Amino acid sequence: MYDKTKPDMKKILNEICAKYTLADEVKQRDIYPYYRPISSGQDPLVTMADGSKVLMFGSNSYLGLSDDPRLKEAAEAAIRKYGTSCSGSRFLNGTLDIHEELEAKLAKFVGKDEAITYSTGFQVNLGVVSCLGFRGGFIFLDALDHACIIDGSRLSFSEVRKFPHNDMTVLERKLRMTPRNAPKLIVVDGVYSMEGDIAPLPKIVELCEKYNASVMVDDAHGLGVIGENGSGTASHYGLTDKTDLIMGTFSKSFGSLGGFIAGDREVINYLKHNSRSLIFSASMTPAATAAASRALDIMIEEPERREHLWEVTRHAQKAFKDAGFDIGHTQSPIIPLFVRDTFKAMTIVKMAYEQGVFITPVIAPAVPENDVLIRFALMATHSIEQVDEAVEKLTAIFKKLEVIS
């Protein structure tokens, strides 16, 4: 029975949520940049819900495969054979033969014993980091690790220790302060999703060997982009054998949805039977699985896609530098255009959109307040001419708002 003497919890929740005002403030200024509906595929030129067409420089489809006819055909064939859903967990009735086929291909691709797929990339990190964060152990996180890694660490039993971005001196100091025989897991992004730089994996591996730690690389933004055949950061450095766990997602270069973790057989077996976001979630849909599998084939068969991606990437990086932009230390198709002011960044996004360029703002807490930026992302399907058009328009906007001179 409802007790009238107790506070109205719904009202309290509403009051707490009402204290969040940033979105309303931005809407009042008419510079709200989120939830813009698109009514076409993620191609270089997309059609918005209002019928307008804009150049897309905000997508993670690095190889331009998300609208590829071959992936669509694979997805359609899978739906016809398996239906639209597996209607259950991988642990129970939700394992298909195409799941296992994809996992075998992924393990070979990244050079590991085995792989297991999850229904989203977020669930991979949530389930793996929490599961391997043993009681009495330690998890070491880079300050710019993705939110799902941070959330996974919060669900673990381990003590979490953060270190400044790519600061190996601080990481070593923190490792030195932990018991040598305690479980230690270092988790880093391979390619950092907001600023585009690459983790110093050689030094991390060296520290792992010195302090008896393991390393997990979230290669969501590295797979398809760097390494042999696009096999990622560990391959890029020639450190596949010394990288304990490699995580990847299918929503970027693979043009699908889902994720995976690959590693030694005993670790993957443990995760299969203990990772909660795997066991208690429905499995990847047949369509997503088939599309990811076909994308992996194309990734290997068509290196020219990656070569062109790097051609437009190098061109864009040089063009922005020559125009006076601060693009940080990017080493990838993710180019940060630092603005360092939240409202100004959102104003830039609106002005660019009105001129036919779709870009995205990155604000706190995704980055520190003084590192607010515009994320400019390239695809293998972009042309040099499209890049030049976007750079020209953004240069004029940044100068008008006095971000660059």
Please state what every model-predicted region is.
Residues N229, S235-Y270:
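Active-site PLP attachment segment
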Residues E73, A77-G121:
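Conserved N-terminal alpha-helix of the aminotransferase class I/II PLP-enzyme fold
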Residues M1-K6, P69, E73-A77, K81, ...:
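PLP-dependent enzyme catalytic core of the Aspartate aminotransferase-like
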Residues R161-V217:
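Active-site phosphate-binding strand-loop segment of PLP-dependent enzymes
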Residues E302, E307-A316, K321-Q355, A366, ...:
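Conserved PLP-binding catalytic core of the aspartate aminotransferase-like
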Residues V128-A147:
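Conserved PLP-anchoring active-site segment centered on the Schiff-base-forming lysine
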Residues Y2-K6, E15-T84, A213:
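N-terminal "arm"/small-domain region of PLP-dependent enzymes with the aminotransferase-like
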Residues S283-E302, V312-R314, K321:
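Structural motif of enzymes handling amino- and sulfur-group chemistry
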